[in-house]
Curated annotation (Swiss-Prot):
Disulfide bonds: none
Molecular-function GO term, any one: endonuclease activity
InterPro entries in the record: Homing_endonucl (IPR027434), Intein_endonuc_central (IPR004042), LAGLIDADG_dom (IPR004860)
Domain of life: Archaea
Name of the protein: Uncharacterized protein MJ0398
Length: 271
């Protein structure tokens, strides 16, 4: 049996509308409760149904109501989530969080503004760390965003397809980099890279995917020896016109990455 607290924001809204429609059809409160239990395996009390029908209860009093309809900002957040960001549940406080830790202040500013745009109130902090570079943190508390991002990635892809430039910018801001001859992005998730490749293709950006590190390959990270748990993939953009189209249509939010991209274009123009 599913508890109301386990439902997403949109699922609760849909359920409220369904409850009210049943009431208009002259179902009793008890009948509505039983019908929802049988049809949807959702446990909802008679008293809650009464409050909903009389508009005397707002189920979002303790939940930030945010705009999860497709938008450039939400698409960007999804791209960031597939890269540097993570979501987690803090059991001590019973709160759900979206968080990202990065070295670039301009990056966290864009993430912060995107979170604000969809209705959240994120916080930014600067944390000094002994074992790695000091990093900026941006964090926002939202059960609705947590549940939204916890969906199958195919559902998130639907939003990304509506705003591909913003999704790709978020993903490349997180995982992308520029070398002397290419733009590249690395990730364990081959399906995610293939999806990104298709989006790039629609923007007239040719890219290729290959294995960057095979499973079991040894790596030294800050003095610690690690082994790749799975094949690690790289998506690369080499062709001059594709690099140029990427710069025009996607680019980076991060200044240092934009500067490297500009240098790559200048180098390509000389040859």
């Amino acid at each position: 049996m599913v508890n109301l607290k386990e439902l997403s924001q949109n699922e609760v809204l849909e359920l409220i509308n369904y409850v009210k429609s049943l009431r208009k059809q002259n179902f009793s409160y008890s009948q509505i409760s039983k019908k929802i239990e049988i049809e949807r395996n959702i446990k909802i009390s008679k008293s809650t149904i009464i409050r909903w029908c009389k508009n005397s209860n707002n189920p979002f009093n303790k939940t930030k109501f945010i705009d999860l309809s497709p938008s450039p900002e939400l698409s960007y957040i999804i791209g960031v989530y597939f890269g540097d960001a993570n979501i987690y549940y803090r059991k001590k406080t019973g709160s759900y969080y979206f968080r990202i830790k990065v070295v670039d202040k301009d990056f966290v500013d864009v993430v912060k503004n995107s979170l604000i745009k969809i209705g959240l109130n994120p916080t930014i902090s600067y944390v000094e760390e002994k074992t790695r570079s000091n990093r900026w943190h941006v964090e926002a508390s939202s059960k609705s965003l947590y549940k939204f991002l916890s969906q199958n990635k195919e559902e998130l892809f639907k939003v990304a397809e509506k705003y591909p430039e913003d999704f790709l910018r978020g993903f490349f801001d997180s995982e992308g980099y520029v070398t002397s001859n290419k733009i590249a992005l690395e990730n364990y998730d081959l399906e995610l890279l293939e999806f990104s490749k298709e989006l790039l293709k629609k923007l007239d950006v040719h890219s290729t995917i290959h294995i960057a590190k095979k499973k079991g390959t040894e790596s030294n990270i800050r003095g610690e020896i690690y082994h790749y748990k799975d094949d690690f993939y790289r998506l690369s953009i080499h062709r001059k016109e594709s690099v140029r189209n990427f710069a025009i249509k996607v680019s980076f939010s991060i200044k240092r990455k934009r500067e490297r991209l500009q240098k790559l274009l200048e180098s390509m123009d000389k040859h």
